[in-house]
């Protein structure tokens, strides 16, 4: 016991030679597949039981080899797993002075001084808009908005009365003690000792910065001091902070910070823990945390220099509503004076008598002539107008849209043809004054043409009756005049009403019946429907 057999090296150091296959058959290693130690005997194959260790140990569980997975020549004897030592598949820590494990698959070798599992590194990059100081973590709430302005070099307006910042400073704080009291304030410091000027579309340095300007450079949050739970409950906003260039400002000194124009500044957030009984003015470096965000740098100006910054302010600042309204009102007045474009069912020209002169630019089916008996009507696609009877002949459409008829006076001019192919400018057509009516009116129409009724002979002379316009509808003549003998020329020829016997004299005889007798009135009443 304790003597290592010759030809067998230490397995831990990797010096054990591979067993030779000479003189060994396939069944020679069957006795080595499983190892059964004798009671009270130690495992001779475990090199850790050698005399070099000097300490005995008790045997553990056996780990047999997987049957049938390897050939006999490649089967290694099993090794007992001892409590307190790594089992199969586990690794020993690297020995002292070793270089650790070699790099594998492109991964560098770990630092041996850091052990097998090195701890986290503290120099990792923080995400944008987040700063850490000790246990406190502060995030810039409107980081994305500040980044947009920072791409074009943020500008802040300063005035005598003071102007609020936009974007304003807003932070989210974490890591404070809920019951401790903290004081928060913002100060503004110079970024460099240069004077800036906007030239050729960019900001360039020109000369040295002016001397320190007297005035307030500190703005304390109105809620200070307060508990940590109060500060962490919601965002800490400095929206009431104002910037001014008035050196002798005496009003609202605590709400304004005095700056110089054309200088670059950097705002900073200070969080100071206030102890009980300690004055607010007293602060030490041990309980003060300062947070700086590079994207909040700005150049103080009295008027915006970069047009990109001006547009960003108008688009994102809710207080710039007046700028947007003035800009939009310049075009709103023009839009209101111009009528909206007509719809597809609206005719652009209102003068129907001159429609044939435009080569039928806006044709409308069944406009001047009645529709075919079997043709369906599209009540939506046809336009509707309310005009004189000589301009329209589709009374059914008015009834469909529930419009009341109204008689409008007809303007003098050429009449509209009611037949297909009729040309107003035909030679000899002239400009007739009397309207033309279709041979047969629609029985369902709401309008009935009016014709002239004879007047009382005692009310006026025949010349006045002949010159008076037609006001009464045409009815079947009692006795037609001799001039109306040509009835075969057309049904559309007008016929004059004469209740008296035909004669060459237009004056009525003394014994002629009155047109207002009962017999005469009955024939007029038969014309009108009940």
Curated annotation (Swiss-Prot):
PTM statement from Swiss-Prot or TrEMBL: Phosphorylations at Ser-52, Tyr-76, Ser-224 and Ser-508 are regulated by mTORC1. Phosphorylation at Tyr-525 is essential for its interaction GATA3. Phosphorylation at Tyr-219, Tyr-265 and Tyr-304 enhances its transcriptional activator activity. Phosphorylation at Thr-302 is required for its interaction with NFATC2. Ubiquitinated at Lys-313, leading to its degradation by the proteasome. Ubiquitination is essential for controlling protein stability, binding to the T-box-binding element of the IFN-gamma promoter, and for interaction with NFATC2 through induction of phosphorylation at Thr-302. Deubiquitinated by USP10 leading to its stabilization.
Gene Ontology annotations of biological process type: lymphocyte migration; negative regulation of DNA-templated transcription; negative regulation of interleukin-2 production; negative regulation of T-helper 17 cell differentiation; negative regulation of T-helper 17 cell lineage commitment; negative regulation of T-helper 2 cell cytokine production; positive regulation of DNA-templated transcription; positive regulation of gene expression
UniProt KW keywords: Activator, DNA-binding, Isopeptide bond, Nucleus, Phosphoprotein, Repressor, Transcription, Transcription regulation, Ubl conjugation
Protein's cellular compartments: Nucleus
Residue ranges: DNA binding: 140-325
GO molecular function: DNA binding; DNA-binding transcription activator activity, RNA polymerase II-specific; DNA-binding transcription repressor activity, RNA polymerase II-specific; RNA polymerase II cis-regulatory region sequence-specific DNA binding
Modified residues (Phosphoserine): 52, 224, 508
Protein role: Lineage-defining transcription factor which initiates Th1 lineage development from naive Th precursor cells both by activating Th1 genetic programs and by repressing the opposing Th2 and Th17 genetic programs. Activates transcription of a set of genes important for Th1 cell function, including those encoding IFN-gamma and the chemokine receptor CXCR3.
Protein name as it appears in the record: T-box transcription factor TBX21
Species name: Mus musculus (Mouse)
